[in-house]
Amino acid sequence: MEDIIYITGHKNPDTDSICSAIAYSELKNKLGFNTVPGRLGNISRETEFALNYFKANAPKLLENLSSNQDIIIVDHNERAQSVDNLEDLHLLEIIDHHRIADIQTSYPIFFRNEPVGCSSTIIGSMYFEKGIEPSKRAAGLMCSAIISDTLLFRSPTTTARDKEVLKKLAKIADIDPEKYASEMFKAGTSLKGKTVEEIFNSDYKAFNLGDKKIGVSQVTTMDIEGFDEYKKDMLAYMNKKVKDENFNAVLLLLTDIIKEGSLIIATGENTDLVNKAFNVELKDNAVYVPGILSRKKQVIPPLTSAIEGK
């Protein structure tokens, strides 16, 4: 068993997944542990902007981890989103802000899960609880994660804690959250030069909801109309994913952070779940739903209820 403890977020990592791993690794190392941040996929343009802005290296891409390797996971607690051989590893901790899912251990672990808008909000709180000041780099990355996950407090997942922690971290990082958010979102929402596969997998998660296997990708944009040229190829890619990976439905949320709503594109034999969950009617595999900003709070719960017949 290696001496190192790897800390990683979920597959198809978003900004919170990457930044939380880096920030929590710094905290654990300051507490005397030997940790290394990792990742389970490519980095998005938004995350790349944050890393470059705060002069941080991308975490190590984790592949083929040996049995009993010590690991801490952040920003998820769902097996389908985690390391492929998680059951062979030695899971030490989980830090997360999502629903309690299906990861199990045969021994007790430290598991901190809170109903806040971002995992970095929890990790930032842990710094302050322990009286440890994060570096400017770690503070900036946690700010980036909170801004990203809460859409700068536009998302309904936002809590008072998110606002409080961001305010403290922004002082350490020496940034104006509004100005920085505008720059980060602008960098992150550009689709120019991307393939449909890159767009879809920039923030994609698989869920087992009741007896259904559902895939949900979310792409933040400032221009939904600009996606039209990608739609045909995107539907072909999503249909292939449904067939190859036995999904009941695959969804893409194109979330407009200015208009505060999402265009939902859906494929698969159970796309009727979208109609039922949101009281809408898909037309040509798509429907715009005002007010939908959060996959976690506004998409997964109604889909679950639709599946369960509630």
Curated annotation (Swiss-Prot):
Residues that coordinate or bind Mn(2+) 1: H10, D14, D75
Keywords (A to Z) from UniProt: Cytoplasm, Hydrolase, Manganese, Metal-binding
Residues binding Mn(2+) 2, per UniProt: D16, D75, H97, D149
Single GO MF descriptor: inorganic diphosphate phosphatase activity
Cleavable signal peptide: none
Main location: cytoplasm
SUPFAM superfamilies: DHH phosphoesterases
Entry GO terms, CC: cytoplasm
Compartment(s): Cytoplasm
Keyword Hydrolase annotated: yes
EC number, as in UniProt: 3.6.1.1
The reaction(s) this protein catalyses: diphosphate + H2O = 2 phosphate + H(+)
Gene3D superfamilies per UniProt: DHHA2 domain (3.10.310.20), inorganic pyrophosphatase (n-terminal core) (3.90.1640.10)
Annotated family: Belongs to the PPase class C family.
PANTHER family listed in its UniProt record: BNIP - RELATED, MANGANESE-DEPENDENT INORGANIC PYROPHOSPHATASE-RELATED
Protein name: Probable manganese-dependent inorganic pyrophosphatase
Gene name of the encoded protein: ppaC
